[in-house]
């Protein structure tokens, strides 16, 4: 077994053990779509109240898994935006109840695909948050029904773009949404500190992937929102275990993609254990195969006696 497989197995077993503990109030609707929850974990725990809409959205669910389990109550809206679903799969399976709102959100759907299929019932609310939509595309297509909340959150929208276009959306009566700007992955803690006059939203700042646990601890005077912190992908299980007195939101923790990720220190600890086991195995093989060792001598004598 490779080190990667060893760590993956440890993580798998660790998740199983955590799920067995009733003291944690997991929300299985959210947990079902958590990328740490694999198909094997779902199959091994049929007693859990898994949510099939969440499972349908889970990035570990492939098209092969869906095809091999047609009896499951799949949600085709969520399957439609599952990142494992490509346009080729959709076109090759026209009999399936694909959902075009879901397809509009699918990260495999590019602007070229949208342009090549103008008569499809695209949903511009979801297209606006599609990671393939750039600012140039938005500027060149003013006539489209863009959703400015989702544009504000779109990872292709940088702080420089926002600053340079603060007036343009307002004139079009489509202002930037500062709630979603607060969550935008291009917004850093330095930007927030340097712009205290902006109508930041602390729920979404608390969730912003640039906000680390160290930043939160170093700025306890800020109005952090524990619902957002609970969904922040910098929060891992070690942080939660060491801070059980905090007002964690278990619904959002269940949805946190990093919640079951192993910390670097834990991976180092597991790696040391792995290589220690390897050394023990190698040493044992040396002991039983090298006549210089007593255990090998005894083995050879025993095998010789069995032959006569």
Where are these regions (language model features)?
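Alpha-helical scaffold segments
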Residues: 1-270
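Calmodulin-binding IQ motif alpha-helix
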Residues: 265-308
């Amino acid at each position: 077994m490779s080190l990667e497989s060893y760590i993956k197995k440890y993580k798998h077993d660790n998740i199983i053990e955590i799920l067995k503990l009733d003291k944690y109030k997991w929300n299985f609707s959210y947990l079902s779509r958590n990328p740490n929850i694999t198909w094997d974990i779902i199959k091994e725990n049929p007693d859990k109240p898994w949510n099939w809409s969440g499972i349908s959205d889970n990035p570990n669910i492939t098209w092969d898994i869906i095809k091999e389990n047609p009896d499951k109550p799949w949600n085709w809206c969520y399957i439609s935006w599952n990142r494992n679903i490509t346009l080729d799969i959709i076109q090759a399976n026209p009999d399936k109840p694909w959902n075009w709102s879901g397809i509009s959100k699918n990260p495999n759907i590019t602007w070229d695909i949208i342009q090549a299929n103008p008569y499809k019932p695209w949903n511009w609310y979801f297209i606006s948050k599609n990671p393939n939509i750039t600012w140039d595309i938005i500027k060149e297509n003013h006539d489209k029904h863009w959703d400015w909340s989702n544009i504000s959150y779109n990872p292709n929208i940088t702080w420089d773009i926002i600053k340079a276009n603060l007036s343009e959306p307002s004139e079009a009566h489509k202002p930037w949404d500062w709630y979603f700007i607060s969550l935008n992955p291009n917004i850093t803690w330095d930007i927030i500190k340097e712009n205290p006059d902006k109508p930041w939203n602390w729920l979404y700042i608390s969730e912003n992937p640039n906000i680390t646990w160290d930043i939160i601890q170093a700025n306890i005077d800020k109005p952090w929102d524990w619902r957002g912190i609970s969904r922040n992908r910098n929060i891992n299980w070690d942080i939660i275990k060491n801070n059980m007195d905090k007002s964690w939101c278990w619904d959002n923790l269940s949805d946190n993609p990093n919640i079951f990720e192993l910390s670097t220190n834990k991976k180092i600890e597991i790696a040391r254990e792995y290589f220690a086991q390897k050394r023990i195995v190698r040493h044992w093989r040396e002991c039983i195969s090298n006549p210089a060792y007593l255990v090998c001598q005894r083995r050879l004598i025993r095998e010789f006696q069995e032959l006569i």
